[in-house]
Regions:
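Solvent-exposed, amphipathic alpha-helical segments
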Residues: 11, 15-23, 69-76, 109, ...
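Short loop-to-helix capping motifs
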Residues: 50, 116-121
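N-terminal intrinsically disordered/low-complexity leader segments
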Residues: 1-7
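Helix-turn-helix
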Residues: 11, 15, 19-61
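Hydrophobic/aromatic-rich alpha-helical bundle segments in the mid-to-C-terminal region
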Residues: 124-128, 132, 146-193
Length: 199
């Protein structure tokens, strides 16, 4: 019985997440989620305080999935790099993928999650724990890179961890403009900052 209950809860979150990929958040209704999940209205209110609580939980799950992927990617780069040049070449490839213009929707999603937490203490705490986990993991990874001589020790590893996240999300300011910057030039600038300031 407990397994069935948990499955229903997960189905509601999964259905909500799938709809978030297809529709603007304001266009998603509880009835759309219930139909997609094959669940009843009473089951939704059994697991969640209200519709907003279900949305919050789904945002947290999606955020957590992105956090785990980000941690694995950066840890692999540092573990597999044997020289400083190998490290920065791998970092260049990562920059090219994370800064891809086609990932604008992902940046907008992250911005919505952060904005949603401003006046929602419960959601902010849940999101904050995951964000802390990401920053802590990146900090540890940066410390390893510093110990291996890939990055200099003139800055604290945590500062570097926050910096790399900031410019990744910061691309969003160009996503909404009509006259957009040159992608290659942007990636070149990031690579230069990484090598000349962080390296």
């Amino acid at each position: 019985m407990a397994h069935e209950s948990n499955e229903t809860r997960q189905n509601l979150i999964k259905a909500t997440s799938e709809l978030m990929d297809l529709h603007a958040i304001e266009d998603i209704s509880a009835s759309m989620i219930l139909e997609r999940a094959g669940a009843s209205k009473s089951s939704m209110y059994h697991f969640f305080e209200d519709f907003g609580d279900l949305l919050d939980e789904t945002y947290v799950v999606r955020f957590g999935e992105n956090v785990r992927v980000s941690i694995v990617v950066i840890e692999k780069i540092i573990a597999r790099s044997t020289t400083k040049e190998e490290f920065f070449v791998a970092l260049d490839r990562l920059t090219a993928s994370t800064q891809d213009r086609g990932l604008a929707s992902l940046r907008f999603s992250r911005a919505r999650e952060l904005a949603r937490s401003e006046r929602n203490e419960k959601f902010q705490k849940s999101l904050g724990k995951l964000q802390q986990q990401l920053t802590d993991s990146l900090t540890s990874a940066f410390q390893t890179a510093q110990d291996k001589g890939f990055l200099n020790k003139d800055f604290e590893a945590r500062t570097g961890a926050v910096f790399i996240q900031a410019y990744t999300l910061g691309r969003i300011v160009d996503d909404i403009t009509e006259n957009q910057m040159n992608d290659a030039d942007w990636q070149k600038l990031i690579g230069r900052i990484a090598r000349e300031v962080l390296g």
